[in-house]
């Protein structure tokens, strides 16, 4: 996954959708609900330069399930988009699915949101 794509996802989630989000780990005191992202790349890019990536956003709260579901709905309704990054590479983002994940802690709630990201190299 390119740095530009990570920066793009961060900008969409935090600036546009106003979701409390960080990549890989939350480093400050956590708000009531917050989200952390990570990714898994496919084996190799296709001949056309397209690489498909699974981007996982985990949401956590000690509050209500409803707060996580509201953020999930916001992501689901607003995340699908395409863009040309500053590098000239293209990116397409698609909502996949979501599921509640047991944490083993009765107070801590977790939701996993799966996105599919397609990166297209710019020919450079």
Predicted regions and their residues:
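Active-site-adjacent structural patch at catalytic or cofactor/ligand-binding sites
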Residues: 52-59
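Extracellular/virion structural assembly segments
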Residues: 48, 60-80
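Short C-terminal domain-edge/linker segments immediately following a structured domain
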Residues: 54, 65-71, 86-92
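A broad, low-specificity signal marking well-ordered, structured residues that form hydrophobic/aromatic
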Residues: 33-35, 55, 113
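Small/polar-rich, solvent-exposed N-terminal microdomains that initiate assembly or binding
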Residues: 1-45, 73, 77, 82-87
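Short, charged interaction patches at domain edges and termini
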Residues: 1-11, 40-52, 91-124
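Residues that form or flank phosphate/diphosphate-binding pockets in enzymes
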Residues: 30-31, 66, 123
